[in-house]
Amino acid sequence: MILDKFKNIVNLSNSNTEKEEGKNAEINENNDPNTQLAHEPSIVEADEKTFFDEMLGAPQYTYDEFLQVLKNPIEERGDTEDMKKHWGYPRRWKVILWDLHIQNYMNNDFNAFVDFDFGGNREECRIQRGSTMKIYAKGKTKNCLRTPVVTNVATEQKKNMNFRNVFEYRGSYLDLENEKLRIRVWEYKQFTLNKLEGIYEEPLLSFAVGEIYNETTLYKFIKDSRVKRCRLYFQLYFQELYDFELSFLNWSFSDLLSSSYIQAKSYNYLSNKNNVKKRYIDDTSCNIFPHMCKNFKRFHKKKIYRKVRNYDIDKNFSFNTALSDDSDERKNKNDRTIKNLEKLFVRNLTLMQNIEENEDMSYKNLQNINLPNPRVTITLSHTPKGHEGLNIISIEQKSIRFPIWENLGEIYFRGTLRDLDVSYLNIKVEDMSAPKSAREIGTCQISLKGIVDYPYVMHELEAPSWLVKEAKYEGWENKLNEWKLGTVEGKVIINRVPRYRQRGDIYHIDSKQPYLIVHIFNIDKIITVDNIKELDTYVEVSFDETSRRTRLMKKTLSPNYDSQISIPLRFNNKNDINYENLSKKGLIYIDVWGKSEDIVYIGGISISPYEIFFNEKNVRRNKTKLEHIDLETNVKITYDTVVYRGCKKLCFLHDDQRMSNIHFSIWTYPDILGNSTNQKKIVAPVSFNTTMNFPIKLAEKYNKLKKLFMEVLKTIKSIPENCTDVNTSTRFYNYELINQRKEKHFLPTLITSIKSPYCAESMNAIFHYVRCIPFIHKKENIIFTPDFTLQLKGGNALDHSLLLCSLFLGIPVLAFVCFGTLWDKQKHSWVATFEYNDEKNYGIVKFWETTTGNVYILKKRFIDHNRLKGLELKLKESKYKSHLRNGFLQRYENNTDINYIKEQTKRHIKQLFKNRINDIPIGGPSLPYKTIDLIFNHKNIYVNLQHSSPLNIWYDYWKFDFWFPFSSIEYNLQPSFTIKSFTHKMEDMELDKIAKELRTNIEKNINIYRASRNLSTRWNRDETLEIFLQVGLELLHQLNTSRKEDVLLAKLKIEDWKKALYHKVPQSHRLLGFPYHFNTYKSKFISDKLISTLAILESRDRSLCLSLAVCLYSLPGNFISCYIYIITCVKITQRELRKMEIIKEKAQRMAEIKNSQKKKKSSDDQNIDIKTMDDVEEKETFSSTNLDDTLHDEHTDIDTEKKKHEKDNYKNKKIKNTKLKDANIDNEEKDDHHHITDKKVSKSSDLIHSFDKNDISKNTFDKEEFINNLDKDKKYSSFKKGNVVNKKVSIKNEPSINIYEDHKIYDDENISNNIDNMENNQDEIYNLRQGKTIINEFQQVKKPQKYTINEKRDDIKTKKKRSKEKKKQDKLEFEKLIQSNAYFEQEKKKLQEDIKKLEKDKEQFQKEKIRREEKEKQLLLEEKIKLQKEKELFENEKLERKMSYMLKINELEKKKNERNKMEKSYKRMIQKDKEKKKKKESRDKIRRGEEEKMSADENMKEEQKMREEQKVGEEQKVGEEQKVGEEQKLREEQKMREEQKMREEQKMREEQKMREEQKVREEQKMREEQKMREEQKMREEQKVREEQKLREEQKMREEQKMREEQKMREEEKIREEEQMKREKKMRREEKKKRVQEPIKIDEIQVYDIIKNEKMKKKEEKEEKKRKKKKEDIEDKYKIGKEASLDENNNERQIKSKNIQEISDYEYKNIKENKNLNKFDEKLDLNQIYSKASNFYDNQEKKRRTIKVHANRKENSDSTFSHIDDSIKNKKEYLEDSNIARYLYEKRKHDLIGKGNYNFDEPHYGKKMNNVAYQDIKGSNLFKGFIEEPSSKKSPQKKKIVIVRKN
């Protein structure tokens, strides 16, 4: 090979030849290129030069090292065998190299050829063997290519090398990283060795991922510097040959027409050309009148009235009464507008009636016509050679219009990704019941571009060829455009895809297919709004639902593209290739795009097909001959076609008068105009109009509909009467908008149903996807269509709402775009979705705000919710159900007369406005929208005829008295745009790189910001903490993208994560967490946002520590969802702890005051109406009707407290309307009285039985509490009667009829049994009412089962005897108790006053304590301050001495430098003088020699004069040469002097730098000394604090002892009381036994003695146990005391504060809540974390913080310990399944992202280990936040202190 001539070269130090070569090269660059070289280098010199260039950068080894390198094993990647095979399996790659150009940068011409080494790992190495250097090569080459020689490549000339090669490369994915493409450019020499001019190397992976078009510059080393030699331009197609498996799933067809139907319909045009039938539609899809416009009678009114009541509608509550008090005037205005609307609608009956105006026929008009038997065939077209004829044929289905094939099958396709993108699917639908000639009923072609990333397919079927011919022959071709032959929907899923993708398009033509070819030349000047100086640009051409791009031109504003684009033309048949069909495909759009940090739209133009073939004078253009060369076969094809060459001005989005022209040419392959038959009839197309693509009937009446629309707005008075343009109004009533191409479009044409590429079923995920598109502020009133916003990657709120609505329609969902105004009167748009709640049976409206991410929910906003339910079911129903429903309607409907329909519509309009419901819904969330003006979807526009506020209207858009439709018929409109395929997600390597840069830049910017404020930043980069934070970000992303069913689970996961974070917080620290979400990855924008919003970044606390987590998700369309989580941890100071204590104490006081006030109010209310027992008995208190009053319980209340509060507020506002509702409410109460009484009786009986079952009797029973409860019951019974009047005033949100539907209704048998039980237990109830507190009786009630039957009988007898005697006494006692109520209340008041006094005394005592402590602290601080001041003075003096000494040294150094400068300058002057003298002497010598010669020559003869003159001329020449040499010497001397000057200046600069560095060091020393002083201060303060803490701890321990002793005493008292009770029980039992069975006294005494002995033994055992417990507690206390001295100061502080904070009530709760530290699934659903997604909390701010309690571990007197709890937690962790454990299992090895389209793989910007959840839980997450005191630093600090003291 090439290196054979270098075998014997040993040294590489021969640099003389290289220098000479460099000098010659420099001379050659300066000379002209045409002149020949004076001296050509020898062969040896050329060899050495090429060797130097080739071996530059080659690795150098010793011989042993080289042998080790050869023995290294082959690299492998992957943990499993499958992954190893994935990376190491050799694959096939298709390579095409063509369009190679070379450009010379040198001044000399040269003959060039190029070598390409594609692949292979051959590498030359320099090896030292002893004293010699040798070259060895390792590895092999795979593909070597060489171009032909190109002669005379001139300077700055771009010359084509006419080289093209196609081959296959074989290598694995690892080989792409290791192997390279090596390019060598050689200069061809005819008689000597060829000369190497430059080498270029690049790994193959960069070409497999990069652009197809490549430009590279090659450099040459001349005089140890790199110089540009030449530039290569080439196109390299490098893609993997892959076996794709196309699986066709869920393919469905809708609205198919049978062949017999098509023939009958075409025959109908011939038979009835003039009499075309119109029919009335009653289908819910396009019917405004829901009940066939029938007459309404009185019973219909009653039904409407009942519906109104069922939906909480108040008839007398009108349109405007809810908003102001002047309801009468507003009513009159409202009535006027309603009358005017009625008149207007009657006048325009032809526009309002619901008649189908399309001339289609349905199955109901035809007889003996069957439904189709469809069969589908799918074939691939435009495929590479060898793939023609690949097809799938489905199974035939019989008599169905909506067929579905869940799995059509698979097609196996071998090729590259580009081959797949270029190919098309030809779909043919056949009716197998028809003959062969007319079997085809629909065809279409679908492009497969982007099918790998976006698998959804949807298209409309076109007419078959036999039908088109028939229509042309019979003359009804225009009517064929209105036909709807059906639609296709389906999925083409490709499970496995190549790993790498190449960017860019190829110009390729298949000779069998027609193409539109566009040649883009250049653009004069690119103009932008911001006047960007450099921009990367490309041109995109789109036509016939396909688009192609040119190559990218970098960093130029006048790009020269010179690239051709080929767009395949879709024709169903070869006979259809003509101008007529080409012109139907629309305009050709050429757009120019730019790439910088953001994507920029520069401008665009549009061209009609007519302009290609005809000039401005409507004359056909001439044909020209063109050539095409096939890439793979290299075969030339010549053809004749019409070429249009032109230049057009770009149309900008902004208003700009500057010129920017694009030069291009367009033609077709083959010539399409030659195939057209009717060339004479071709007419120039009409300019663009909004009604261009409308149905014919809608286009005819469009102007009338616009006039009616304006008249409706004027009658509502939302627009002034003089207004002619809607754009000038303050409200948002636009029905047309201008798009990016400056074309006006009807609003419904700007929306269409699009299947979402990201989580197609989740509305939250789609909303999140749309919000990840950046927002752009637009000055011009222009809207972007959804495809344009996706391509531009930006838009305003209206553009986002259009895209969001179209994605919602693809789910499918009832979605609308809303136009309205904000509270600042700005026009705004948002999205609304209508849903039906099955559980609660009402309709819901959701407003999706794209700018803020909020979702507002309005409940109960539909009157006819059944209609809403039907519409929702119809959207979600399957195709088969829709087939059955549609077929039934079409077959069994009857024709109606048009005049009859007009009369019915008249009646219906009048009756609608008569029975118009004037009530409005009230309540709801606070909305940012002031008005809602209109809503629209992809079919129609609806104008709001109700109130302007979105809260106070009904959303039944099908009722035209609420919402006026723009058109009475919902037409199927074609959208004004075509959705291009969504681009693929960003590559993992790029995302990881972006995440790393973002992470580092954010940290860097925060550090710079804090450093600018003289603040240091400390980062905690603990890996376990970062993993934990990243898990939190993943959970937040799950919540934002979860389905409706999974929202609760996502919230539970976040709550679980928060608990784990709380548990790991270190003591005496405060933690704050701030999660953020951004739709960009610009580090500057994100860091500025963080700095501006986070005020804690400005804190000067030295203990502040930060931690950062970054998580990026790649979304379809090359969008990024960026999550950032910042945690700040700060140490809590004593002041903050005191403040927290004060705040807690204040809150407790306020709560106590409120409770006391409530008790006072309740006691005052009880004194109002106090009934005596006689009054109760006279009114039959114990009857079934009044039991609810006597035994009223809180659980039996009908209304909750919230509803009562709403009632009271509502009464005060709406007292005027109460009189009109009294009669209705009274009737309702009478009707439901019997039902209510039965319910109350059943509840009261259950309550009575609860006395028997529940534990009523406790150890102590207070009379006061029992009497108070009794008084409350009495008060409720008396207060209820007074509430009867108040009920008439109250207006509920729910109807009075359905109040009791949710409760269970008891049976009659249960009620009778309950009443019997009540009569048996009357005595017990009576005693309870009296408030008797005898313990024995309550024990009998509690435990009746312990007694025998005889004992019960005796008790009953005794009770009957005593009951008669006690009745009289009971009455008297009851009266006394009633009289004594006042006394008890007085005592209560006195007790409350005493309590308040005690509280005040406590507060004063605490304040005095605080004052004393503060005084002591102040004294200590003053002493410390004095000492510190003295130290500072001493240190300042030292610093001043040092500074003065340093200044003196600096002055001396300056003087020395000045002296040195003076000496050097003096020496230079002396040298200059010497040089001048030498020059003068040389000149004088020359003059003298010339004078002597002249004197000698004068004596010569005249004959010798001529010779002498010649000699003189020669001497003059020599003198001139000497002068030139001297001048050169002078120049060289000047250069040397200048170099010396430069060196001296550099020395001076270095000296200055050294001085500055010394100054900086001194300043640093000063700062360090200051820091040391501050640290000493802090230490002294810490010592003082520690002493205070010790004192406080001692106090707290003494208080603990006192509390423990008090508790022991209380326990002993309780035990004694229990013993007394037991003894009493025993005595009573003994008495009863004596009555029943007489026993001897001796036996009784013996029994008693035995009993007493047993009781004594038990008591002794219990006392021993108590003593042991006391001793154990004392031992624990001693041990704790010793351990507490060794613990950290922070823990002591927190524990002491914790004991002070916890009250007795909280101490009880510690026992109940001891499992707070557990990390399990027992979560409180009422405390779910909902701030992250911001879906439901709309009033709260966007900033979200996670606050962690400083004191997490509680100390209690209970027996449990934290150690036992941790053991239990471990056991539960092993046994039970936990949500958190399920979450934190990371599945990195599963390649889910390759096959699942909805899988999101997070990117963190940092490689993290796969840590298990157990390790995270067991590790200390926050160890980096605490500064651990190191033993090494302390002695250093002590030394510094000693030095300072000395």
Swiss-Prot record:
Residues 16-36, 1193-1244, 1346-1370, 1456-1635, 1652-1692, 1827-1846 are annotated as: Disordered. The keyword Plastid does not apply. Disruption phenotype: Conditional knockdown results in decreased invasion efficiency due to incomplete microneme discharge. Residues 1349-1506 form a coiled coil. Residues 17-26, 1193-1211, 1230-1243, 1456-1474, 1481-1629, 1652-1663, 1670-1692 have a biased composition (Basic and acidic residues). One of its GO terms (cellular component) is host cell plasma membrane. One of its GO terms (molecular function) is calcium-dependent phospholipid binding. Keywords: Calcium, Calcium/phospholipid-binding, Coiled coil, Exocytosis, Membrane. Residues 1834-1846 have a biased composition (Basic residues). It is a peripheral membrane protein. Residues 497-623 form the C2 domain. InterPro entries: C2_dom, C2_domain_sf, CEP76, CEP76_C, CEPT76/DRC7_peptidase-like_dom. Its main location: membrane. It is found in: Membrane. One of its GO terms (biological process) is symbiont entry into host. PROSITE patterns: C2 (PS50004). It comes from the Eukaryota. Residues 27-36 have a biased composition (Polar residues). SMART domains: C2. Binds calcium and phospholipids. Regulates microneme secretion. This is C2 domain-containing protein.
